[in-house]
Amino acid sequence: QDNLSLLDIGTGSGAIAISLKHARPGWQVAASDLSDDALAVATENAHRHNTNIQFFQADVFRQVSGKYDIIVSNPPYISFEDKEEVGTNVLTSEPHLALFAQEDGYAIYRQIIQGAEEYLTENGKLYFEIGYKQGPMLQEMIGHYFPQKRVRVLKDLFGLDRKVVVDNG
């Protein structure tokens, strides 16, 4: 469809929002982040790529209004206990706010999942990037809050869990 609305939570550099807006120019795309610095980078990137995206500062759903057909998020999902698994180049080049989350990496997912129903349209979909060990737990968590929805865990090219899709099936 060409007239969908999308919210990217935790947009960071804006890569997901910008790519989707390029692929679907008719979509209304909004993107939020907690970090002012990230939003400045995202806004500059959107300007460079001639995309019209509404950027705003928000902590998950605070400051969000309206309903969206699609909510996407690549939130911080690394457990602080798994810090040693993260490459040194990532640790030195990425803000830790963008990498690590409380509750063994599930804190931001939980906030999004608990609040998403209020901001999704009736046929709305959720898309998450996930850590390779998080598929089963997220499937269970999402199933609790969205028993009527289909929850799929998709694998990356290495056969590891990498994305969750929540839809009506």
Regions found by a protein language model. Give the residues of each.
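Mobile active-site "lid"/loop adjacent to the S-adenosyl-L-methionine
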Residues: Y77-I108
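Conserved SAM/SAH cofactor-binding pocket of Class I
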Residues: Q1-S73, I78-E85
